[in-house]
């Protein structure tokens, strides 16, 4: 595990009101890699009593954000897709694992898998990142 990747994740998390509001926790970090978790609450359920797709997207997007900023170079999403494969329910602990597939000078491609506590895939997300200049902690 990269100490630098953890530093960058903690620096971002300090200002990440959305991740905090959703109860997202950072579990593991490395360069181009992040694992985050979230427990589905009653407030996250849709009219079918399953986890709202927007909440799943936010979990995957958070893992993506930490992975694509793990090297300390500021990056944002330029495009994202998600496939919902099975529902999450209240009380489920969902884990999103993000891995870099390609990182160029400016753009990157990251795949994120969300699994439930039975290790069954809930959603697959692909994010494309774009480096915007600047650094996360003031040093790259």
Curated annotation (Swiss-Prot):
UniProt keyword annotations, A-Z: Hydrolase
The protein's enzyme class: hydrolase
Superkingdom, natural source: Bacteria
pH dependence: Optimum pH is 7.5-9.
Disulfide bonds: none
SUPFAM superfamilies for the chain: Thioesterase/thiol ester dehydrase-isomerase
Gene3D superfamilies named among the record's database cross-references: Hotdog Thioesterase
Impact reported for residue 61 to A: Loss of activity
Induction description: Activated by cAMP receptor protein (CRP), integration host factor (IHF) and by phenylacetyl-coenzyme A (PA-CoA) that prevents PaaX from binding its target sequences. Inhibited by PaaX.
Pathway(s) where this gene product acts: Aromatic compound metabolism; phenylacetate degradation
UniProt GO MF annotations: acyl-CoA hydrolase activity
Record flagged with keyword Iron-sulfur: no
Enzyme Commission no: 3.1.2.-
Alphabetical GO biological process terms: phenylacetate catabolic process
Family: Belongs to the thioesterase PaaI family.
PANTHER family: ACYL-COENZYME A THIOESTERASE PAAI
Function: Thioesterase with a preference for ring-hydroxylated phenylacetyl-CoA esters. Hydrolyzes 3,4-dihydroxyphenylacetyl-CoA, 3-hydroxyphenylacetyl-CoA and 4-hydroxyphenylacetyl-CoA. Inactive towards 4-hydroxybenzoyl-CoA and 4-hydroxyphenacyl-CoA.
Subunit structure: Homotetramer.
Name of protein: Acyl-coenzyme A thioesterase PaaI
């Amino acid at each position: 595990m990269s100490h630098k990747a953890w530093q960058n994740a903690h620096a971002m998390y300090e200002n990440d009101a959305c991740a905090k509001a959703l109860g997202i926790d950072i579990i593991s970090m490395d360069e181009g890699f992040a694992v985050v978790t979230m427990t589905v609450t009653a407030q996250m359920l849709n009219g079918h009593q399953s986890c709202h797709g927007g909440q799943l997207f936010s979990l995957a997007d958070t893992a993506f954000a930490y992975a694509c900023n793990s090297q300390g170079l500021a990056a944002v999403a330029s495009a994202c897709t998600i496939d919902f494969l099975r529902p999450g329910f209240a009380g489920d602990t969902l884990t999103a694992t993000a891995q870099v597939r390609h990182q160029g000078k400016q753009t990157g491609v990251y795949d994120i898998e969300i699994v439930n506590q039975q290790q069954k895939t809930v959603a697959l997300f692909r994010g494309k990142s774009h480096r915007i200049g600047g650094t996360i902690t003031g040093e790259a």
